[in-house]
Amino acid sequence: RICPRILMECSSDSDCLAECICLEQDGFCG
């Protein structure tokens, strides 16, 4: 996965950029 290292709050993977996934544990993309 190619994920920009930008901390974005998320509630689902679609909130994240590129190939990021939403890390439900901390509520941020990663």
UniProtKB/Swiss-Prot annotation:
GO terms for cellular component: extracellular region. Keywords: Disulfide bond, Knottin, Protease inhibitor, Secreted, Serine protease inhibitor. Its main location: secreted. It is found in: Secreted. Belongs to the protease inhibitor I7 (squash-type serine protease inhibitor) family. Inhibits trypsin. This is Trypsin inhibitor 2.
